[in-house]
Amino acid sequence: MESVKCLIIGSGPAGFTAAIYAARASLAPVLYEGIEPGGQLTTTTEIENFPGYPEGITGKAMMDDLRRQAVRFGTDVRTGIIGNIDTSKRPFVVTVDNGNQIEAQTVIIATGASAKYLGLPSEQKFKGMGVSACATCDGFFYRKQDVAVVGGGDTACEEATYLASLCRQVYLIVRKPFLRASKAMQERVFNTPNIKVLFEHNTAEVLGDEDGVTGVRLRKNDGEEYEIPLSGFFLAIGHHPNTELVAGKLALDEQGYIVTVAGTSKTSCEGIFAAGDVCDPHYRQAIVAAGSGCIAALDAERFLQAHK
């Protein structure tokens, strides 16, 4: 059976940053890219808030850069999906989807989190072309334009108020006849003049053409449908961490995110570390994920030094 010092699962900013640091520490990391090579960023058309790219860069191009850097220092990047981790003893036995098994002295989980979508075909069609699940990431591109936010909780209200500072008009599409957000967030929304809350509305279809989103068709709870022209459509109905692999093996919080020891990447299982959105329900930013990937690699290196 193949044996490795450090196995990294996930190929977003957290995974590849962990790989860069682990490789430079002579841990000869093996990284499995998973179901979505490059992570969520590959669906982002333009990134302007990651340090080092003053002119901006596409998500795919940035992830290609990170991948090349990790490979340059000796990371073994592999295509494949990890199907199981036996955490009962160390080295951990990790099973790949092709049936191969690997013994890993340390494992870094960087499998990310996925935004929840409505499930509309048109929504997926325009993903990255006007449909987004991150106002902080993409709102800047819709300055002085009309946009919509779907959701009724704190996140949706935060996204709407943020977009209102950039956009001409923000429509907050709420399925229920009330907001679920905190009182303070509700007041902020209702006191922002360019936010219009559309209660008891559902999204029937995202409209667009070859250039991207052009509008949305809404359906009231009474069945009436109508269209609104807009340029951006933001989902704020939550995220779910990609933790199916470690459910029942690592401590997870009530939302399913991996619990780490404060200030570290250490999980409830010695020798397994977590980085990026899989353990971060709050920030979900590429730069934060990259930083946590660095922390995970350093923690793994120190763990190996202490367990020689």
Language model features with spans:
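An active-site-proximal "capping" alpha-helix that borders the catalytic cofactor pocket
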Residues: 288-304
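A Rossmann-like FAD-binding core segment of flavoenzymes
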Residues: 70-89, 93-96, 101-104, 165-262, ...
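FAD-site-proximal beta/loop scaffold in flavoenzymes
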Residues: 119, 124-141, 237-283, 292, ...
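Phosphate-coordination loops involved in phosphoryl transfer and adenosine-cofactor binding
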Residues: 3-5, 79, 143-145, 200, ...
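Residue-level detector of alpha-helix initiation sites
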Residues: 12-13, 36, 113-115, 154-155, ...
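Beta1-alpha1 glycine-rich phosphate/pyrophosphate-binding loop at the start
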Residues: 4-73, 145-146, 157-183, 190, ...
